[in-house]
């Protein structure tokens, strides 16, 4: 057990973000589970990547943090494509519909759904290194197809 405060984590993230930004880059982070999403935003992260397939509802618990992220040009990277055998049960349409439900939940907290869509990146829920080549290829194909489908729905 390590006792680390929220302020400690935010300070460390801000230090890293400042270094990344000083080089002209953006800082992104991935969380495989649930977390207090505002810590990442308060820490200066530009791209918050999360497992939206299993934990997508949790981001709606932090609408103020998402507003802050969007206001400074940041993005949510929605890991809506499962990086597990569940990918065999999904299609681009089912995953786009899943994203729509999650975006609707976030929009119900007062965010503009069009802005949510504009500042979204579609990703896998986690890495694919432990999966078969076939499942990995399916995952990356579904990322592209789901993204294209949502771009078409939103006109960009």
Language-model-derived ranges and their functions:
Residues 1-63, 82, 90:
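Active-site loop segments of alpha/beta catalytic cores
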């Amino acid at each position: 057990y390590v006792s680390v405060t929220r302020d400690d984590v935010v300070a460390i993230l801000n230090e890293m973000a400042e270094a990344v930004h000083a080089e002209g880059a953006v800082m992104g982070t991935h969380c495989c589970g649930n977390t207090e999403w505002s810590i990442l935003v308060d820490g200066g992260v530009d791209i918050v990547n999360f497992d939206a397939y299993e934990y997508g509802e949790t981001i709606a618990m932090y609408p103020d943090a998402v507003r802050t992220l969007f206001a400074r040009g940041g993005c949510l990277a929605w890991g809506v494509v499962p990086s597990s055998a569940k990918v065999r049960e999904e299609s681009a349409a089912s995953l786009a519909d899943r994203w729509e439900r999650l975006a609707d939940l976030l929009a119900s907290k007062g965010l503009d759904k069009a802005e949510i869509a504009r500042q979204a990146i579609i990703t896998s829920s986690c890495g694919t290194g432990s999966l078969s080549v076939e499942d990995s290829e399916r995952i990356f194909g579904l990322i592209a197809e789901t993204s294209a489908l949502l771009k078409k729905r939103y006109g960009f």
